[in-house]
A protein has these predicted regions:
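Catalytic cores of DNA base-excision repair glycosylases
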Residues: 3-162
Length: 162
């Protein structure tokens, strides 16, 4: 059995399959990926649901007052993430006419979107090839390949899988 088949089989048996952001909506994927940075899933779920009630789409987020965005973010910490969300929502609204870019280069050029977040948006929202290299993925791949969790060594080792 291939490595990818083993991972998919494990995920089907033990993974989280009913999270509110598991959708092909790039806005929902993006917001969840930003919230999940340095924050556990169980903590994020109620914040995500409340945030979506206040800002159900990129336009409402872009038109919101920053203080309102920060108020909705209160309790999650790392407030720079909320500021970047707000700034990026404005860019997507103004420069991309509320349509998320569907290519890596445009995504990583946006404030607060790095390699892993761009990979998640591409893979989950657009069904395109994208590498999601968060802490959990790094841990699993480094154990499977018996590679030190050294970022540059791990990136080289994971390339054939992405």
């Amino acid at each position: 059995m291939k490595f990818s088949e083993r991972i998919i089989e494990w995920q089907n048996l033990h993974g989280r399959n009913n999270l509110p952001w598991q959708t092909n909506d790039p806005y929902k994927v993006w917001v969840s990926e930003i919230m999940l940075q340095q924050t556990q899933v169980s903590t994020v779920i109620p914040f995500y649901e409340n945030f979506m009630k206040s800002f159900p789409n990129v336009l409402t987020l872009s038109k919101a007052n920053l203080d309102e965005v920060l108020k909705n973010w209160a309790g999650l910490g790392f407030y720079r993430r909320a500021r970047n969300l707000h700034q990026t929502a404005k860019i997507i609204t103004d420069e991309y006419h509320q349509v998320f870019p569907d290519n890596y280069e445009d995504l990583v050029a946006l404030p607060g979107i790095g390699e892993s977040t761009a990979g998640a948006i591409l893979a989950l929202a657009f069904n395109k090839k994208g590498t999601i290299l968060d802490g959990n993925v790094k841990r699993v791949v480094s154990r499977y390949l018996n590679v030190e969790n050294n970022p540059s060594e791990l990136k080289k080792s994971i390339k054939p899988f992405s």
